[in-house]
Amino acid sequence: IYLALTLYALHQQGHTLPGDDMNRQGVGLGQAVRRLVPQGEDPADSSIQRRFNALATAAQTREIAQHLRGMIQLLRAAEVPLGYAQLAKDLFYLQFPDSASQVRLRWGQDFYAIPSENDQIEEETNYG
């Protein structure tokens, strides 16, 4: 939980207005990171995908934290929100081998899912 809170604080820096909350329920890590891929670019060819893979395959908590900090800085720069309650749960379950693979699978599925038209409209409306 501590890591999720510190990452939220990092993400929230510079966002002081009430509508600028970078915590968005229902936005998983994979989905948020996917929004960093430039429109029209294949996610598989993206530098974001390489960073995402490094995060998803990290085995040690310290390594996961390091990769997450870098990813959160990218999300902050692009003003892409993330669901921090889900991230806290994910970080908890990553500690256990039986559930870690499920967390990584969901992250990957969310990253590679084709965004719906509603997601694209919301993204254009909210993020530029």
What is the predicted role of each segment?
Residues 22-94:
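Conserved binding-pocket/active-site segment within a compact domain
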Residues 8, 64-68, 111:
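Generic hydrophobic, helix-prone segments enriched in Leu/Val/Ile
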Residues 9, 14-15, 36, 59, ...:
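Residue-level detector of solvent-exposed, low-hydrophobicity positions
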